Amino acid sequence: RDLHLSLRRQRQMCIRDSSSTDVGSLLLDGFGDGVWLCSDFSNDINTKLSFGILQATRTRISKTEYISCPSCGRTLFDLQKVTSEIRSRTNHLKGVKIGIMGCIVNGPGEMADADYGYVGTGVGQISLYKGYEVVERNIPADTAVEALIDLIKANGDWVESN
């Protein structure tokens, strides 16, 4: 049951917002399992938006998801740089959710539904999580991204990118 939505003459951000709220709420209520979006933008933009809505409503999982905190004074590593590196190395892992958190204070709670977690625990120290459980502590920050990838591989969630 596809939902068809035709949006014309709107800015791209407005189309993203209106289609997400209009179609997303219907999908969450069980009134469909697909999206057919038509707009004045390219098919690529329409397709990305449609799959984004399906992913957000858990109707169809088609990409890796990331949870990341906004960073604060407790963050003791370059969160933006590490997040970018993790995304570039793992963005092909369809259906995997990875939390990247700056500190131990709120990080584990904010990423509670992640499959894997990368959490700063001190100066130059990272802890890795599988689900809500800590599986490795006090990993040096310079090797922690590779350790995260090794953890994903060890749990059978790694596939090689094309």
Regions inferred by a protein language model and the residue ranges of each:
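Conserved structured catalytic cores and adjacent interaction surfaces
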Residues: 43, 72-76, 104-110, 114
